[in-house]
From Swiss-Prot:
The name this protein goes by in its record: Dihydroxy-acid dehydratase
Record Pfam families: ILV_EDD_C, ILVD_EDD_N
Textual note on the cofactor: Binds 1 [2Fe-2S] cluster per subunit. This cluster acts as a Lewis acid cofactor.
Species, as recorded: Shewanella woodyi (strain ATCC 51908 / MS32)
Encoding gene per record: ilvD
Binding residues annotated for [2Fe-2S] cluster, in chain numbering: C122, C195
Statement: the UniProt record of this protein carries the keyword Nucleotide-binding: no
Oligomer status and interactors: Homodimer.
Amino acid sequence: MPKLRSATSTQGRNMAGARALWRATGVKDSDFGKPIIAISNSFTQFVPGHVHLKDMGSLVAGAIEEAGGIAKEFNTIAVDDGIAMGHGGMLYSLPSRELIADSVEYMVNAHCADALVCISNCDKITPGMMMAALRLNIPVIFVSGGPMEAGKTKLSGDIIKLDLVDAMVAGADERVSDEDSEKIERSACPTCGSCSGMFTANSMNCLTEALGLSLPGNGSMLATHADRRELFLEAGRRIMDLATRYYKHDDESALPRNIANFNAFENAMTLDIAMGGSSNTVLHLLAGAQEAKVDFTMDDIDRLSRKVPHLCKVAPSTPKYHMEDVHRAGGVMGILGELDRAGLIHNDAYHVAGKNLKEVLAKWDIAQSQDEAVRKFFSAGPAGIPTTKAFSQDCRWDSVDDDREGGCIRKREFAFSQEGGLAVLSGNIALDGCIVKTAGVEEENHTFIGSARVYESQDDAVAGILGGEVVAGDVVVIRYEGPKGGPGMQEMLYPTSYLKSRGLGKACALITDGRFSGGTSGLSIGHVSPEAAAGGTIGLVETGDRIEIDIPARSIKLAISDVELAARRSAMESRGKQAWKPVDRIREVSLALKAYALLATSADKGAVRDVSKLED
């Protein structure tokens, strides 16, 4: 039977000093010998997805202590990608994932915690905590802050749903009046919670359900709804159950690496493809798999993308549905239920909410569940009242959306598309692959041939788009923005938004070794690997080159001869120390970012740090 990790600092005469310090935190004599459960919170007043989390740790702690454990809370950082977008702040977003993972590891291992509750929500926080949880491999459960309500306003006499991207596009579109732009801005983000569409934060919180690491509803129940309170309380109870199973009964199925195994990663990626999740999830799943010591790669993602249909279409791919609508349709469990009936997932995978996924779906999939409490749970809806407070309303839809032919979630035979929402492309410009969110690409653009318009940075690309350099038929190439070359692999939401505002959203393509916000739509191809700074072919593209994109064939090609390509590579290598670096780019890079760049890998490896580089 495994010994409690915390015994290292709580048992034996030689730990008198440590016990004295534990007592100073409120630990009583009767507490020593109980499991110490770490609560990793991510409250901050900088981020709407985290502004309401201050008291959530106390909720979880109360449930843990009622169940016989000791709860100790600490906090991590949280970067708001939307606020950091479009300026130097975005360089810090992806590297913050590694800092979050490290900080959780540091706190949990330094204090010998026995188990972990991760209170996360936004873009890099859930992935960072996931990496730490799989690295530590102690009992863990995730509970997120939940999505915000969709914005709503009246324009031209019609009530429309809004999100952050609508505000960005309107602000850059000269055809939108100042009055309408301000109206959209004031309405786009009405409440606390992660942005209301299927952006990165919500995608990742949904994927924790598929990985088996969070409770049903975690990814879809609104942050403002009173029903979400029970998720936090249940997380506290469940983590004690998991800790008991492992430490008292030697049940290793309670450990995250046994829950999030290869089959679970396949389930998560299958869900991601079916719901058209953010392309950033590919980075984070690849990174998580490495921490879990699971051999899950871009090849597996490519294989799955060819057979999984697009069953759930959500903003930014359509203005009709937001996360509140996904929840009404049964949430993640509704999508997984349809995938299960299509024979596309492993329903024997372990899950923190039950014995296995099959058992969990039997209760929580509204298409098969007979439990009226479950239908009531998924009827939780928005109030339409601006607020920064969690659990502030108890509104409900009159009915759930169980229309699997024309609703938000569909059966396989009525899918939005038999092609999934994400695809891996490869070719001479991306030898190790790249990612496109096909859910946001118009069918007429699934094949595209255009002329390269090359920029050495996101800033130059934005200036070129707004300055009229980019015209219909161009393929905008933004390079040296990968994990190493940026450094930090910036999101390119502003360039894609500005293309839309110029009426070029369907007339141009954009490819980059950077990445895209979950709010991006259009023919936007990111994660080009190897990146330019690592010697990737994208660093050899010249303005005017012909680029051929064929999503059905999963190919992307720089249409020049092998001889010409070899000559360009030779010329680049001849530049010595200036090879594979941007020309004339002025950018302040801090010591912290330089340290990240030294170890960063390209996107096909999850942009994780490779410490073996220190040994070369």
